[in-house]
Amino acid sequence: MAVKIRLKRMGAKKTPFYRVVVADSRSPRDGRFIEEIGTYNPVAQPAEVKIDEEAALKWLGNGAKPSDTVRNLFSNQGIMEKFHLSKQGK
């Protein structure tokens, strides 16, 4: 089972709100997911990002692949840097 960390769209028309979820890559965008690890609100100024860092690092360590947008969010939060350092054993 290929697992991805991606955004699940919530909110009303023209006002997107996203949940950062871990899901099987074959399930639909807004379909079944394994675990919710955060939220992303692009409408707020500045955009609000809340991510459970421990859960994100756990799933990245287990081989989950983040989508491009989630990778950018993780990089801005410093999660990708921590993941790469832990992979190198530092």
From Swiss-Prot:
Q: Name one GO biological process term.
A: translation
Q: Name one GO molecular function term.
A: structural constituent of ribosome
Which UniProt key words apply to this protein?
Ribonucleoprotein, Ribosomal protein
Q: Which domain of life is it from?
A: Bacteria
Q: Name one GO cellular component term.
A: cytoplasm
Q: Which PANTHER family match?
A: 30S RIBOSOMAL PROTEIN S16, SMALL RIBOSOMAL SUBUNIT PROTEIN BS16M
Q: Give the record's family classification.
A: Belongs to the bacterial ribosomal protein bS16 family.
Concerning NCBIfam families, the annotation shows: S16 (TIGR00002)
Query: What is this protein identified as?
Result: Small ribosomal subunit protein bS16
Source species: Bacillus cereus (strain G9842)
- Its encoding gene is what? rpsP
